[in-house]
Amino acid sequence: HYDVGNDFYRLFLDPEMVYSSAYFTSHEATLEAAQEEKLDRICRKLRLKPGQKLLDVGCGWAGLSCWAAKHYGVTVHGVTLSQAQLDFGRAKVRAMGLEDRITLELKDYRNVADSGGYDAISQVEMFEHVGFANHERHFLEMKRLLKPGGLYFHQASVRRGGRDPIKPTPTTKVITRFIFPGGELDTIGMTVTNLGRFGFETLDVEDMREHFELTLMHWTQRLYARREEAYALAGEARTRLWLIYFALFKKGFERGSVQVYQTVAQKRRPGPSGLPLDRKSLYYDAPTVGTAKVARSAKTGLKARVAKAIASVTGSRSSKPKAGV
């Protein structure tokens, strides 16, 4: 799925190459602004501070890893199972001059050795690949890797509550056969229950269903507009399959049969959590350096260096949409 080629994903993703639900502050917001907002909210929800260590599980093309290191001053260890993503991410890290803060590896997170070494862990829409049989192991690994009182961020798509998560539907059969082999969706109730069972206190749960519907709308429009380029990169059959996959999930989020949540949990420790009692710091008192507004005003020189490094990995430049398409 992820090794179809970086150039293919660049046709419909934002410049940060974030392949997960964005966070829209309005229906008029651009995909670029919404993805930056999402990255920044993750950092705020994890209460990241300079000098802390963040483990980015399923780091993808290193969008969150780079954002957290650049804007919040943390040291990041990112792991992925995709060689294409790793090559892209490492080129981006070099171009941004963040080699001293970010380490990216081709590694299964269960093989990360630094037990109790992380202040925070992020997992953004990787959990869908874990499978029901491995849920217990997943949460126990998160617990093992976190320091006492460390924070775990969990963003994942789920089925609507009250439905049997084990029983496949016609839609999920298509998705798991052709798009995400082995993928399984639990419910938000299962997520919160498992966090409690395996050593966590759930601190915050936020519904992102309508945000993902908007994200998929943007992805569909972008990929369809550049479908001829996609045919050349991945073939017509695969491109059409992706468009069907986007349409199915967009409809699922629109109807509410599929949902997505951001959940923040803390590794249990005796006494107070040490976190603020209200949400002001998440939504109103965010540090100036970590806002999407500031990020969008970054120097063009840095953006040019990043683009050049990315082009060296992908072997080509991103093409503009053809006129009239």
Annotate each predicted stretch with a short phrase.
Residues 158-273:
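Substrate-binding/catalytic lobe of Class I Rossmann-like enzymes that use SAM or dcSAM, i.e.
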Residues 61-72:
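Conserved SAM-binding loop of SAM-dependent methyltransferases across substrates and taxa
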Residues 1-45:
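Conserved Class I S-adenosyl-L-methionine-dependent methyltransferase catalytic core
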